[in-house]
């Protein structure tokens, strides 16, 4: 009987310890309460389809992972991997020694990169890496998570800092906490100064200029919306919502310079995120679980095409265990779409669906 009591006491002690852990163990976030907008996943304009079923995958057996973004220049393809390697058709072009995310070539054929670890950097034709900016000169706040960029005809580089609080790899903390730590910034190569244009963004992600460069878009991943910041005209210096209540988490965005913005959705909206938006204490409890037991993304390719007024003109999807997912960037070159992924080993390509 005494032995049974000892076992019972140990079980009770372990049970109490588990309860204390899940209810009181410190976590590195202070979640806020918010009201998630109406779930639009079942709306007709976002209806499930198989238009991305036939994505062809390239360079998936070269030993690298996470070609987040893709650029084409002089008939060559450039991709950046999670190892820091920048690869082209000719082999390894350079290595940022960080985590290259958004990329674009400037007018002098320097490859400008939003590097999540190193900041805003430039790589010349010989593969030499140069740091352009690591903080905003207007508020003196250093970058934590430089994410995406676009370059204007005058050379100015518009880019995002996803979070001024959490660095690369802490995306989940940003999602669970839900505080506006993101920024939209601009770097002027003429003055070598960086200015903050927009503060208080909920995970500032993709950045893209309009065809006439009168405005620039920045995705707010954790709010399912895209902000428009006016650069010209009477509204210059102000911002407004371009589109909101998206059916998933917007990642990168690009313009085909013919009036279409292509938006990569990392994943459809998540039931737990929806349900727990106004339950910050519950999000703390779930964060204490092993990551494998926390909400996970599904295999779902998802891309939207928007005109410059924010109207949906393309809804491209494919949900399957064989889907190329997650798609984190999409760019159009001639009549093809090129896809990047934060975690997939290869990049994808498909003809622009009609």
Regions found by a protein language model. Name each.
Residues 2-354:
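Sequence-structural signature of mature extracellular/luminal beta-sheet repeat domains
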């Amino acid at each position: 009987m005494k032995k049974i009591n000892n076992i019972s006491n140990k079980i009770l002690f372990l049970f109490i310890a588990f309860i204390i852990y899940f209810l009181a163990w410190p976590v590195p976030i202070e979640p806020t309460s918010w009201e998630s907008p109406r779930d639009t996943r079942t709306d007709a304009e976002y209806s499930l389809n198989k238009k991305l079923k036939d994505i062809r995958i390239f360079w998936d057996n070269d030993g690298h992972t996470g070609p987040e973004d893709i650029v084409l220049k002089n008939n060559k393809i450039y991709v950046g991997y999670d190892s820091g390697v920048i690869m082209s058709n000719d082999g390894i072009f350079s290595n940022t020694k960080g985590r290259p995310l958004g990329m674009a070539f400037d007018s002098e054929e320097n490859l400008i990169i939003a590097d999540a670890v190193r900041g805003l950097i430039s790589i010349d034709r010989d593969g030499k890496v140069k740091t352009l900016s690591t903080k905003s000169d207007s508020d003196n706040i250093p970058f934590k998570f430089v994410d995406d960029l676009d370059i204007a005809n005058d050379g100015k580089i518009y880019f995002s800092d996803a979070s001024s609080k959490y660095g690369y790899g802490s995306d989940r903390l940003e999602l669970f906490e839900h505080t506006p730590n993101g920024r939209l910034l601009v770097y002027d190569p003429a003055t070598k100064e960086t200015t903050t244009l927009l503060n208080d963004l909920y995970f500032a992600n993709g950045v893209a200029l309009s065809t006439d460069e009168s405005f620039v878009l920045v995705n707010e991943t954790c709010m399912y919306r895209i902000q428009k910041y006016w650069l010209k005209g009477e509204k210059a210096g102000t911002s407004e919502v371009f589109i909101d209540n998206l059916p998933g988490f917007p990642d990168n965005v690009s313009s085909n310079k013919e009036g279409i913005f292509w938006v990569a959705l990392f994943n459809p909206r998540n039931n737990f995120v929806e349900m727990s938006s106004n339950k910050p204490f519950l999000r703390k409890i779930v964060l204490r679980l092993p990551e494998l037991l926390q909400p996970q993304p599904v295999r779902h390719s998802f891309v939207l095409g928007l005109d410059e007024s924010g109207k949906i003109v393309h809804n491209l999807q494919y949900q399957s265990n064989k889907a190329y997912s997650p798609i984190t960037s999409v760019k159009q070159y001639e009549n093809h779409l090129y896809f990047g992924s934060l975690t997939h080993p290869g990049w994808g390509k498909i003809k622009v669906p009609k």
